[in-house]
From Swiss-Prot:
Name by which UniProt lists this protein: Ferritin, middle subunit
Family that this chain belongs to: Belongs to the ferritin family.
Every Ferritin-like diiron domain range: 7-156
Recorded GO MF terms: ferric iron binding; ferrous iron binding; ferroxidase activity
Taxonomic lineage: Eukaryota, Metazoa, Chordata, Craniata, Vertebrata
Keyword Nucleotide-binding tagged: no
């Protein structure tokens, strides 16, 4: 049954929103994996664990916003299987941040692609929604991750575990 509230909402936009929901849930799932990896007793970096747990919750909120948007536009939600994260072991904090940066770049590209689909189908509501709730936030997240990676690299954190510990404690807010 078609929605009575649907107006100027192209089927391509609807399908792309469903794919974006899946990508946001995958990102949340990946960040959950990272969070609990860093809270393991043999890794024990609580600042990284907290940072990735917050990112997981943020990505889940992004998915929820898209689900709400889909319903408000009269679209239909078709959830897909959520892919397993690319790894179970995330290595050092630097390794995980590099994976996180790539994940955020992938999400950003998917959002830009979604914006293009909306623009191509003259959907100003979707364009405004993406610009208001997602695009700037993605750029800020990418910048923050890049800064973290630069600082950890500068401290040679892969070889210097004390640097990683201090970064976790002072930058990521880790408490024992």
């Amino acid at each position: 049954m078609d929605s009575q509230v649907r107006q100027n909402y192209h089927r391509d936009c609807e399908a792309a929103v469903n794919r974006m929901i899946n990508m946001e849930l995958f990102a949340s799932y990946s960040y959950t994996s990272m969070a609990f990896y860093f809270s393991r007793d043999d890794v024990a970096l609580p600042g990284f664990a907290h940072f990735f747990k917050e990112n997981s919750e943020e990505e889940r909120e992004h998915a929820d916003k898209l689900l709400t948007f889909q319903n408000s536009r009269g679209g239909r939600i078709f959830l897909q299987d959520i892919k397993k994260p690319e790894r179970d072991e995330w290595g050092s904090g630097l390794d995980a941040l590099q994976s996180s940066l790539q994940l955020e770049k992938n999400v950003n590209q998917a959002l830009l692609d979604l914006h293009k689909i909306a623009s191509d189908h003259t959907d100003p509501h979707m364009c405004d929604f993406l610009e208001t709730h997602y695009l700037n936030e993605q750029v800020e997240s990418i910048k923050k991750l890049g800064d973290f990676i630069t600082n950890l690299s500068r401290m040679d954190a892969v070889k210097n575990k004390m640097a990683e510990y201090l970064f976790d404690k002072h930058t990521m807010g880790g408490k024992n």
